[in-house]
UniProtKB/Swiss-Prot annotation:
This is Urease subunit gamma. It comes from Polynucleobacter asymbioticus (strain DSM 18221 / CIP 109841 / QLW-P1DMWA-1) (Polynucleobacter necessarius subsp. asymbioticus). CDD domains: Urease_gamma. It catalyses: urea + 2 H2O + H(+) = hydrogencarbonate + 2 NH4(+). The lineage of its organism: Bacteria, Pseudomonadati, Pseudomonadota, Betaproteobacteria, Burkholderiales. The gene is ureA. GO terms for biological process: urea catabolic process. Pathway: Nitrogen metabolism; urea degradation; CO(2) and NH(3) from urea (urease route): step 1/1. SUPFAM superfamilies: Urease, gamma-subunit.
Length: 100
């Protein structure tokens, strides 16, 4: 199977998000890469489901709360930008202050 670099990046994000989901389900607090991966994967999946950029920008702020992540992580993540594939093409989604 031949994958483009973009496809490889998407699979890496998805794999990291699965790991983050499992750790969160076990009650562990997520670190920086796990938090970014989980939010990014949710945005990518929402885009595939047909949600709008505005919906995803809002939903991106509701995926994780301070109680879900290690101390200091919310301050480290000011913005998350992810290129997501929508039914009408690829668009950049920016989530400001994703962990409140």
């Amino acid at each position: 199977m031949e994958l483009t670099p973009r496809e490889k990046d998407k699979l890496l994000i998805f794999t990291a998000a699965l790991l983050a989901e499992r750790r969160k389900a076990r009650g562990l607090k997520l670190n920086y890469p796990e938090s970014v991966a989980l939010i990014s994967a949710a945005i990518m999946e929402g885009a595939r489901d047909g949600k709008t950029v505005a919906q995803l920008m809002h939903e991106g702020q509701t995926i994780l709360g301070r109680e879900d992540v290690m101390e200091g992580v919310p301050e480290m993540i000011q913005d998350i930008q992810i290129e997501a594939t929508f039914p009408d093409g690829t668009k950049l989604v920016t989530v400001h202050n994703p962990i409140v």
